[in-house]
Amino acid sequence: MNVEPIWQPVLLEEENTVTSHREPGEEFLFYRSVAAGLIDAVQDNCSRGAFENMEGVGKLSDNPVTNLRYHFVVTAAMLTRFCMEGGMPLEEAFGLSDEYIRRMDCCNNMSEIVYVHDQMAMDFVCRMRQLRKNIASSKQVAEAIDYIYVH
């Protein structure tokens, strides 16, 4: 691969810096929980402050607020795709994502971004829960669907 000289110092600096990234398991569990409509699991994730824990995640910006903004956009994109895969209509999913990204764009600090993130996660999960309830034709079917998504 031929890399332009302007990028070589950046690449060399990155090679000398050891960055430890955590496994994506917890992150993907969060996305699957939202798509499955598992409100309690998502509330737990938000109350634990999992989103604001920057340990082991990529450093997308040297500015902590900008870094969190970028991670917010990634989360919004992932939730959108997981929820569409779970049955949320395309326009609803993209509309939610766009709206919450615009709300985040008005935030001035990390705590405001975290607040909007938690609102977004709860909005997506509640909509997915309602969607799944509408699909289930009986209590037994709803319980079976819950069991499948949890396991």
PLM regions and their residue ranges:
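Inter-domain helical "communication" segments and dimerization helices
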Residues: 1-151
